[in-house]
């Protein structure tokens, strides 16, 4: 970002503050004019056009239109906002990365608060299964690209749902010195954190923590669960999105944002609250909890004293976030001979004795399942060494040694892991018994066999 752009952003902020002061002076002047005993004589001299259109004459005295006063009036009378805060909101710009369950409510409330410029970055398309939480979209927009790409904003909201994007967005905010409001939600829980606030240059440990400070190492790939896999309750992600909007509004209205490189020596730097992470749990006895976090880590890769991150790395694409998070390839543990197409399994199941194991969690199995299948959740295989009391041992104890076993899951990933696990336990009888998974899982079952299969 060049110096001219930074100077322009600094000037816009100065204009907003000056307009707020001007509004106060105009209020004082108006009060004096109303008390002036000669006010009637002044009104008599008012031009006919001004008498015909008094609204236009009055509006010229105020920094906002009368419509804006009416729209944001109840917000402006809150002491934490006021006229100055509202003018700051009007001149501010916010970038939302992700227009899904978090981004939709956040965008709605940010726009409703009167933020002047809102950018939305999202390369995904609208899916019908997302409409219960992505409230800006409707069924007639299914398949439409959600948003374009916008840059150069005052605050960034991370409304994505994957570690790779969270690390990427945080790194960019550190390098460009932008505060970041990050949130996540899964099942019945959510978390919220304001990062890089204050947004000081890398190496300045008085700045706010970044995402790498809080999570130096990404979670293992097998531990990452998306809303599509783990499920989400709409109001939960809605709560977190609204809280993101609230944090952004608080930051802007407080006047604590500063342009990159701006150094005002005439006023002390405002004291920032310690970084905390807000934890929300629908089923908890205390739904909201705050966890206090340490500041910037001195050895942080992105913002520490010897930060190794540079804009050139981001521009050139040399920073591989997929590799960093350990997600270099899709799951491919089995050979083609160990996998079977859904249509081929459909033919086999009608003619041959076999065992079909569905490794989805019970809550998903109860939604819909293939007739004759047995449910042994994927979670029961994690850490299991094939003990005698494991459901799999009970199920296969009296099974013919040559009876084939097929494994199915939702998308064809967990089923590969379980198939390999079963072979490692020796259930393939040293190759005498076929054990394989249904390629593509139940999604392929819907595409190739049963078009009426519920897709969730």
Curated annotation (Swiss-Prot):
Q: Which UniProt keywords apply?
A: ATP-binding, Cytoplasm, Metal-binding, Molybdenum cofactor biosynthesis, Multifunctional enzyme, Nucleotide-binding, Nucleotidyltransferase, Transferase, tRNA processing, Ubl conjugation pathway, Zinc
> A single Gene Ontology molecular function, please?
nucleotidyltransferase activity
| Cellular localisation | Cytoplasm, Cytosol
Look up the record and name the pathway of this protein.
Answer: tRNA modification; 5-methoxycarbonylmethyl-2-thiouridine-tRNA biosynthesis
Q: Which residues form the Rhodanese domain?
A: 350-454
Q: How the cofactor binds, per note?
A: Binds 1 zinc ion per subunit.
Tell me its EC number(s), please: 2.7.7.80, 2.8.1.11
InterPro entries assigned: MOCS3/Uba4, Rhodanese-like_dom, Rhodanese-like_dom_sf, ThiF/MoeB/HesA, ThiF_NAD_FAD-bd, Ubiquitin-activating_enz
GO biological process, alphabetically ordered: Mo-molybdopterin cofactor biosynthetic process; protein urmylation; tRNA wobble position uridine thiolation
What does the record give as the active site?
A: 227 (glycyl thioester intermediate), 409 (cysteine persulfide intermediate)
Q: What class of enzyme is it?
A: transferase
The set of disulfide-linked cysteines is none
Domain of life, per lineage: Eukaryota
Binding residues annotated for Zn(2+), in chain numbering: 210, 213, 300, 303
Q: Which Gene3D superfamilies match?
A: NAD(P)-binding Rossmann-like Domain, Rhodanese-like domain
- Catalysis: reaction(s): [molybdopterin-synthase sulfur-carrier protein]-C-terminal Gly-Gly + ATP + H(+) = [molybdopterin-synthase sulfur-carrier protein]-C-terminal Gly-Gly-AMP + diphosphate; [molybdopterin-synthase sulfur-carrier protein]-C-terminal Gly-Gly-AMP + S-sulfanyl-L-cysteinyl-[cysteine desulfurase] + AH2 = [molybdopterin-synthase sulfur-carrier protein]-C-terminal-Gly-aminoethanethioate + L-cysteinyl-[cysteine desulfurase] + A + AMP + 2 H(+)
The record's section on SUPFAM superfamilies has:
Activating enzymes of the ubiquitin-like proteins
Q: Name one GO cellular component term.
A: cytosol
Similarity-based family: In the N-terminal section; belongs to the HesA/MoeB/ThiF family. UBA4 subfamily.
PANTHER family in alphabetical order: ADENYLYLTRANSFERASE AND SULFURTRANSFERASE MOCS3, UBIQUITIN-ACTIVATING ENZYME E1
Per its record, how is this protein called by name?
A: Adenylyltransferase and sulfurtransferase uba4
Q: Which organism is it from?
A: Sclerotinia sclerotiorum (strain ATCC 18683 / 1980 / Ss-1) (White mold)
């Amino acid at each position: 970002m060049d110096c001219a752009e930074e100077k322009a952003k600094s000037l816009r902020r100065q204009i907003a503050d000056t307009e707020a002061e001007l509004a106060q002076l105009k209020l004082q002047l108006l009060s004096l004019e109303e008390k002036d005993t000669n006010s009637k004589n002044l009104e008599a001299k008012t031009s006919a056009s001004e008498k015909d259109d008094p609204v236009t004459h009055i509006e010229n005295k105020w920094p906002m239109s009368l419509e804006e006063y009416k729209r944001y009036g109840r917000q402006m009378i809150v002491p934490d906002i006021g006229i100055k805060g509202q003018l700051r909101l009007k001149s501010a710009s916010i970038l939302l990365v992700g227009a899904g369950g978090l981004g939709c409510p956040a965008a709605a409330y940010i726009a409703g608060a009167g933020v002047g410029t809102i950018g939305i970055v999202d390369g995904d398309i609208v899916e019908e299964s997302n409409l219960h939480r992505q409230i800006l979209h409707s069924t007639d927009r299914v398949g439409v690209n959600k948003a374009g790409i916008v840059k150069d904003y005052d605050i960034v909201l991370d409304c994505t749902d994957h570690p790779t994007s969270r690390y990427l967005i945080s790194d960019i905010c550190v390098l460009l010195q932008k505060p970041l409001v990050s949130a996540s939600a899964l099942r019945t829980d959510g978390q919220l954190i304001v990062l890089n606030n204050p947004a000081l240059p890398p190496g300045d440990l008085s700045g706010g923590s970044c995402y790498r400070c809080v999570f130096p190492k990404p979670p293992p790939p097998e531990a990452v669960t998306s809303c599509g896999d783990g499920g989400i309750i709409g109001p939960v992600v809605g709560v977190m999105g609204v809280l993101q909007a609230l944090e952004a509004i608080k930051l802007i209205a407080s006047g604590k944002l500063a342009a990159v490189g701006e150094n005002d020596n005439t006023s002390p730097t405002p004291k920032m609250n310690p970084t905390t992470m807000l934890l929300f749990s629908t089923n908890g006895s205390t739904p909201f909890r705050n966890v206090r976090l340490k500041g910037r880590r001195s050895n942080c890769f992105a913002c520490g004293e010897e930060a190794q991150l540079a804009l050139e790395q981001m521009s050139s694409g040399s920073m591989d976030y997929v590799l960093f998070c350990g997600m270099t390839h899709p799951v491919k543990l089995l050979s083609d001979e160990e996998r079977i197409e859904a249509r081929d399994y459909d033919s086999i199941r009608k003619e041959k004795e076999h065992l079909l194991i569905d490794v989805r969690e019970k809550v998903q199995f109860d939604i819909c399942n293939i007739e004759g299948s047995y449910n042994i959740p994927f979670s029961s295989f994690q850490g299991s060494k094939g003990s005698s009391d494991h459901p799999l041992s009970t199920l296969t104890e009296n099974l013919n040694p040559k009876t084939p076993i097929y494994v199915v899951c939702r998308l064809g990933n967990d089923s590969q892991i379980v198939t390999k696990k079963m072979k490692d336990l020796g259930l393939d009888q040293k190759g005498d018994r076929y054990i394989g998974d249904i390629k593509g899982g139940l999604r392929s079952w819907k595409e190739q066999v049963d078009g009426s299969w519920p897709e969730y």
